[in-house]
Amino acid sequence: MANRIIGVLAAVAVFLLGGLQARSETIPATDARVSYIGRTLSDNGSVSFDWTGVYLKVRFEGSSLSIRLSDSKKNYYNVWIDSSMDKAPDQVVATFGNDSTITLFSTPRRKAKQAHQIILQKRTEGSQGRTTFHEFVTDGVFVQADGPSERVIEFIGDSYTCGYGTEASNKERFSPETENQNLTYACAAARYFGAEHIVMAHSGMGIARNYNGKVTEDNMTARYLNTFDSAESPAWKPSEAGLKPDITVIYLGTNDFSTGMQPAQRVFVKNYIQLLKEIKEFYGEEHPVLCMVPKHDILMLEYIKKAVDTCSLPGVHFLALSPSVHNNEEDMGADGHPNYSGHKKIAYTVIPCISTITGWELSTNPIQ
């Protein structure tokens, strides 16, 4: 009788253990249940990207979630757990090394009775490295993550759009830890409209001339065509993206006019029109584009307005920021770049223009 009881208990233990093991799941980063926003490249089950602001959503039923990844340098990511991107992140994680594992969520199993959704957003830019996600692991099961919004805004920019130094004080120098793309005018404007945001931005880049440099072919006009910020190939194919933006916003020119210099007007205008043509080739001739003029230089306004007026392309709009759009003390972060307060003020300026161009109604939504 004792032997029989032991045998039954052993069978029950094996059954329970098998049940627990059966509920654990590992999926490749390319699994269709994971939702990505931004330019990525899928290869052999892994997903690679380096543009700032790329984000993903993954949903699971279980008590833990980890991700296996590699990074060519060191990046920082915002992590939201059962929350939204208009809130402060629940944690910030660093990605580095080859084939490393990061635990994003862990809670006692008895409390894991519902589905959890994790949002993971790259807060640093391409110069900090390329991240490759290999697989996700949970002790439960994966379910379909939230899909993208019906509204999508594309932003092309420089350090302002990257969120360079947004979390630093105006007396601090830049460090990668203080860069946070989520605290930019771009993300604030997109959130106001309930839109997804796709960002191509790199600090120091211009239309024809980069910061403290000469006229160069390595500029945002060229990089916009690439899948990766840090590599010329492969070329980006919008047809494979799955998302088509409703509007593209360009916020470039500051670096062209940096350190008391600027390119010849004909060179700048030629490159700016080339960027406009690239956008139209991606999304169609009627695709709307909003060209923002930074507040720094009146000559820059003349250059960009000349490009808009002479491009002979439909749906190209113009917005010049006033020098008083934000102040240079309380609204500033590292190295003369706006903090979150300054970025929200820029968002307040651009939102009415996006509303007019797209037909999206203004609302009482907070700008955050």
Stretches with model-predicted labels:
Residues 104, 210-213, 331:
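Short secondary-structure transition/capping segments
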Residues 1-26:
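Bacterial Sec-dependent N-terminal signal peptides
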Residues 123-128, 166, 171-263, 295-301, ...:
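Conserved SGNH/GDSL esterase-like catalytic core that processes O-acyl groups on lipids
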Residues 17, 67, 258-261:
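A generic structural signal for short coil/turn motifs at secondary-structure boundaries
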Residues 222-367:
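Alpha-helical cap/lid subdomain in secreted, periplasmic
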Residues 152, 196, 286-288:
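Residues at the starts of beta-strands that form the adenosine-phosphate
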